[in-house]
UniProtKB/Swiss-Prot annotation:
The organelle targeting sequence, given as a residue range: 1-42
Name by which UniProt lists this protein: Altered inheritance of mitochondria protein 18, mitochondrial
Keywords: Mitochondrion, Transit peptide
Sequence similarity: Belongs to the AIM18/AIM46 family.
Record's GO cellular component terms: mitochondrion
Cell location: Mitochondrion
Gene3D superfamilies associated with the record: 3.50.70.10
Pfam hit, one: Chalcone_2
GO MF annotations in UniProt: intramolecular lyase activity
């Protein structure tokens, strides 16, 4: 009898040691990347009951580590030839207001030849991550697709993000709730601050709502131009970091890849600038980086 109990305990501890503890209690559920977990309900239920009774602190640690760290590796390869992107950005490496977690990444390409210009990562404030599923509730999503109000939330969100207008509505509503974001722009080849500045200005002007804003947008764009307080070259692998803060302001930073030094550039206080820019990255008919938009879409779908 004692040997049998010891054997049962060993089995329990092996399950607890699994890197994704939540897989034990959620068989056949879609977890993060929608891969079904091949554990029977009965085995999972029995394991969970004994595990909670015997080792609550181990289980808590496993759940905590999974939610905080396991969704992403420490570094993510985005494009050959540029440094991998960190899964988390924040102090002290960068003077951001808080820590930000990678939502998705891709490459920005221009012209009909798909000339690749920079690698891109979109990050969300760690403290704001609960805003995403709370905003994109089943009730909210049902208002976006009145033809299939009973469809699963993930399906409704996927369809909304494939639609030009509905995807803008989703992103605008997230930003309207105060979701803080960061765009990490890493040039694939040598460039300069003027080219980066002109590219951002052009992208904002191409937002479909820009023509209706007139003087407000013009003043914001002047702020953006002035925020580029540095001149000269930006070598390949340097970073231009854009932080969309809680106030709607857009703070700019430049990180030198060779020295590791970060320079705080200027700030744009007009909220339209940051909102239009991130809307252009993540939604609409022709997002600035389709693979980044698709990558972020997959992540937020996994969160609802």
């Amino acid at each position: 009898m004692l040997n049998k109990r010891i054997s049962n305990l060993a089995t329990i501890l092996r399950f607890i040691a699994l890197p994704r503890a939540r897989n034990i209690i959620a068989p056949q559920e879609y977890i993060a990347n929608s891969v079904p977990v091949a554990i029977t309900r009965r085995a999972a239920r029995n394991t969970f009951v004994f595990s909670v009774a015997l080792t609550p602190f181990v289980l808590y640690s496993a759940f905590h580590n999974d939610s905080a760290e396991s969704d992403f590796p420490e570094l993510v390869e985005v494009y050959p030839g540029v440094r991998p992107f960190p899964a988390v950005l924040g102090p002290p490496e960068l003077p951001l207001q808080t820590n930000y977690k990678l939502l998705g990444h891709g490459v920005r390409a221009v012209t009909f030849l798909s000339f690749k210009v920079y690698a891109l990562g979109i990050y969300a404030a760690v403290d704001d991550l609960p805003l995403i599923p709370r905003t994109l509730s089943a009730e909210y999503l049902s208002t976006l697709d009145t033809e299939k109000v009973d469809a699963p939330a993930k399906e409704q969100l996927y369809k909304a993000m494939q639609d030009h207008e509905k995807s803008r509505a989703v992103v605008n509503d997230l930003l309207g709730k105060g979701l803080r974001l960061v765009a990490k722009i890493t040039p694939i080849r040598n460039t300069d601050f003027t080219h980066l500045k002109d590219g951002l200005v052009k992208s904002i002007l191409n937002h479909p709502a820009a023509r209706h804003e007139g003087e407000t947008l013009a003043n914001g764009l002047e702020e953006l131009r002035a925020a580029f307080t540095r001149r000269g070259s930006v070598p390949k692998d340097d970073d231009l970091v854009l932080e969309l803060q809680a106030t709607g302001a857009l703070q700019l930073y430049h990180r030198d890849a060779k020295t590791g030094q970060t320079t705080t550039l200027g700030k744009v206080t007009e909220p339209l600038i940051g909102r239009y820019l991130f809307s252009q990255y993540l939604s609409g008919k022709a997002p600035l980086s389709k693979d980044t938009k698709d990558s972020v879409t997959r992540k937020i779908i996994s969160m609802v």
